[in-house]
């Protein structure tokens, strides 16, 4: 099952309601303005959204592992109830698909606030009167963008790695649905090793992305 994501961790209940309304109506400038009034800036929002994207990937990782385990149990148990097997695998496929969608949604939220943060940062470089401070801030911006791009690239690798797993899973669930016989189980057995490899690649990419996210969060909090 996909874990319900937490709200941005440091926002009061009242602020959550207000901000949720602003998000729904698409008023990003008003949203940021309201957040800043309670001491929460784009940098803070970015950290929180990266944490949520990281957690969504961790949840998805567990879901895909569970799906593989369920897949394996279906093909190894003798005299498997085919209808029951279909129901179990279909449930795991749906859970995995929702987990993948949640990861993508969280990544989009990260990209949205990051784009706004970096645009604001770059625009405000022109406000400096002290050249040394301006240069230091510009270097910090470039460095932060570079580390962000590396982290985001690892997140997108996760997205790409989920697609072939979901396609393989969906194809086999559909085949089982319309062929509730021994031939269907034989087909699942032939697909298992390939699915396992794809999920192993996915898990590795997720671990890399989670590590990169943690490092990026640590760097921003310094």
Predicted regions and their residues:
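C-terminal motif of bacterial Sec signal peptides marking the signal peptidase cleavage site
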Residues: 23-26
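Amphipathic alpha-helical coiled-coil segments
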Residues: 94-106, 143-161, 198-210
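Extended amphipathic alpha-helical interaction segments
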Residues: 106-191
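Bacterial N-terminal signal peptides that target proteins for export
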Residues: 2-15
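Secondary-structure edge/capping motif, primarily at the C-terminal ends of alpha-helices
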Residues: 57, 64-67, 71-78, 93-96, ...
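Immediate post-signal-peptide N-terminus of mature secreted/exported proteins
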Residues: 29-96
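Charge-rich amphipathic alpha-helical interaction elements
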Residues: 28-29, 105, 193-222
């Amino acid at each position: 099952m996909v874990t319900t994501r937490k709200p941005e961790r440091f926002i009061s209940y009242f602020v959550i309601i207000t901000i949720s309304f602003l998000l729904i109506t698409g008023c990003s400038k008003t949203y940021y303005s309201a957040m800043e009034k309670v001491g929460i800036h784009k940098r803070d929002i970015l950290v929180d959204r990266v944490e949520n994207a990281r957690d969504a990937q961790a949840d998805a990782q567990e879901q895909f592992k569970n799906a593989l385990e369920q897949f394996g149990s279906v093909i190894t148990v003798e005299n498997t109830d085919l209808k029951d097997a279909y129901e179990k695998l279909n449930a795991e496929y749906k859970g995995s698909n929702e987990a993948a969608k949640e990861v993508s949604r969280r990544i989009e939220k990260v990209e949205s606030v990051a784009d706004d943060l970096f645009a604001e940062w770059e625009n405000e470089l022109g406000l400096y009167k002290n050249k040394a401070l301006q240069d230091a801030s510009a270097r910090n911006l470039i460095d932060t963008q570079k580390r962000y791009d590396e982290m985001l690239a690892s997140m997108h690798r996760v997205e790409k790695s989920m697609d072939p797993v979901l396609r393989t899973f969906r194809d086999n669930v559909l085949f089982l649905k319309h062929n509730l016989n021994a031939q269907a189980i034989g087909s699942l057995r032939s697909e298992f090793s390939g699915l396992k490899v794809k999920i192993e690649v996915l898990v590795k990419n997720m671990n890399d992305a989670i590590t990169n996210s943690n490092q990026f969060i640590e760097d921003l909090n310094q």
